[in-house]
């Protein structure tokens, strides 16, 4: 893994910082685990924009990643590490002893030739997946389930992890990167170690075009628009004279958006601001 700062041979390369990993596979992905990935342009089934600033970008194929890690008792060998355009983390192609291949999230330190395993009998080492009742308190884990058997949902981005801080009854208490402490059933699975490719946060795209390759469109301020386009638009000068709102007139900046009261009881401590 190397951090490369480009020489300023042009305005577009002046600020570019790349993360180069020579261990990544340079060929095509494993075809049986690849699906077509259609772009939405940020529109829903009515054709209306639901998420702004999305559109265009290079065509990408979706890699089917195994977040459940439910192939118990069968050891697997890591064949290679690969780039995945759909996520910040790298992925690993693993070959199970029975001949099946799957993609998994590549933990920190995993390399080709390593052995991994899932299930209650798996060793306590990075890359192995166990129910959290079988993982020692204080361990660092990633790809954590919120419901048993549903598949990992917490800590899947590059460099992320969760710490198991307590075990009480049928629940374990987790400390998330945000500072939140929450309870999860101890039968939920997690993978030991932290997600690899932590250097992803150090990259600098360097130019607007690099964002467009990724399907990200420009973000235009509401005050720079006309009244027909945004509640902040129009007027003389730059003051819009009201509380900040979204393009649809809903209050923004500080308004609470979480309405899931059903799971509030599992949050021991709110995330730190």
UniProtKB/Swiss-Prot annotation:
Q: Which SUPFAM superfamilies match?
A: Nucleic acid-binding proteins, Translation proteins SH3-like domain
Q: What does this protein do?
A: One of the primary rRNA binding proteins. Required for association of the 30S and 50S subunits to form the 70S ribosome, for tRNA binding and peptide bond formation. It has been suggested to have peptidyltransferase activity; this is somewhat controversial. Makes several contacts with the 16S rRNA in the 70S ribosome.
List the molecular function annotations (GO) for this entry: rRNA binding; structural constituent of ribosome; transferase activity
Location of the region described as Disordered in the Swiss-Prot/TrEMBL record: 32-53, 221-273
Q: What is this protein called?
A: Large ribosomal subunit protein uL2
One Pfam match, given by its short name, reads Ribosomal_L2
Q: Gene3D superfamilies per the record?
A: 2.30.30.30, Nucleic acid-binding proteins (2.40.50.140), Ribosomal protein L2, domain 3 (4.10.950.10)
Composition-biased stretches (Low complexity): 39-48
Keywords tagged on the record? Ribonucleoprotein, Ribosomal protein, RNA-binding, rRNA-binding
């Amino acid at each position: 893994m190397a951090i490369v700062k480009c020489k300023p041979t042009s305005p577009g390369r002046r600020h570019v910082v790349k993360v180069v990993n020579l261990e990544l596979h340079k060929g095509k992905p494993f075809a049986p685990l690849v699906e077509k990935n259609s772009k939405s342009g940020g529109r829903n089934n009515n054709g209306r924009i639901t998420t702004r600033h999305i559109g265009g970008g290079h065509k990408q194929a979706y890699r089917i990643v195994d977040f459940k890690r439910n192939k118990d008792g069968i050891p697997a060998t890591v064949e290679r590490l690969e780039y995945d355009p759909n996520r910040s983390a790298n992925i690993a192609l693993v070959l199970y002893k029975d001949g099946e291949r799957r993609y998994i999230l590549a933990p920190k330190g995993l390399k080709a030739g390593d052995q991994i395993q899932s299930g209650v009998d798996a060793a306590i080492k990075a890359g192995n997946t166990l129910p959290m009742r079988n993982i020692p308190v204080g361990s660092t884990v990633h790809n954590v389930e919120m419901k048993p058997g549903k598949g990992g949902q917490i800590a899947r981005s590059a460099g992320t992890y969760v710490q198991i801080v307590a075990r009480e009854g049928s629940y374990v208490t987790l400390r998330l990167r945000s500072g939140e402490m929450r309870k999860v059933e101890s039968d939920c699975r997690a993978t030991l170690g932290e997600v690899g490719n932590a250097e992803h946060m150090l990259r600098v795209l360097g130019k607007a075009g690099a964002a467009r390759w990724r399907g990200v469109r420009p973000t235009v301020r509401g005050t720079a628009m006309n009244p027909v386009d945004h509640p902040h638009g129009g007027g003389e000068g730059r003051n819009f004279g009201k509380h900040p709102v979204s393009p649809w007139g809903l209050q923004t900046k500080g308004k609470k958006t979480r309405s899931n009261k059903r799971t509030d009881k599992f949050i021991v401590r709110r995330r730190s601001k």
